[in-house]
Amino acid sequence: MIEVKHITKSFEGRAVLKDINAVFENGKTNLIIGRSGSGKTVLIKNIIGLMRPDHGEILYDGRDLISMNKNELNMLRREMGMLFQGSALFDSMTVLENVMFPLDMFSRDSFKERKKRAEFCLERVNLSDAEHLYPSEISGGMMKRAAIARAIALNPQYLFCDEPNSGLDPKTSLLIDDLIHDITVEYNMTTVINTHDMNSVMNIGENIIFIKEGVKEWQGTKEQVITSNNKALNDFIFASDLARKVKEVEMQHGSASRRAT
């Protein structure tokens, strides 16, 4: 579990996070949602220690991130898995080598054991057949699954995902959502997902935190989203749904244009 208590953060006198209080629950998919520029990314960066808040506490199962020394912070980061907006795979490495990378960096196991662990993670995301391929030889969805395999290679307690469905079609996005959720439950991790995708919210949003202009406006479950009378949240949902429909039309138009040519 991760607890955020009274977090504030300002840049050049402008408040970006304003007294944020939130609990990210263990074994659940915790989603931070909001418009671009709302403070979601800054909040994530503070939580993982890439930024330091001006005030407040960030507790990892009771351990205070802000008071940690460099060695303690490095040890904590080894308990974190990261899934970035792009796949962030190394082009010069095979899929298997990409998944082995964090193991080669931080694990003291033998090469044989590290390779076995990487192969297990690839099997878990249904990519065993692609382990000897390079990123340029696989699809965007497969690259995302490879990135998930790499993120769980060190058996993390905490998983952080930044817009994991960015650039994916709706069907593939659904598969990635389900995979992240299932792995969260299996590993009993605390998973924090930064997204503005309402499909993800309604699919796997077990604990949802809505941020607007640096303020936590609302927190609840996907079931409570439907019945919420929070105007800011409802406006965000409407805008997100409209943007999704426009994107679907553009994708359909693009497919039709390609067929015509």
What residue spans do the PLM features occupy?
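Helix-to-loop junction immediately C-terminal to a conserved catalytic motif
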Residues: I48
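A short, proline-enriched helix->beta-strand linker immediately N-terminal to the Walker B motif
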Residues: A153-Q157
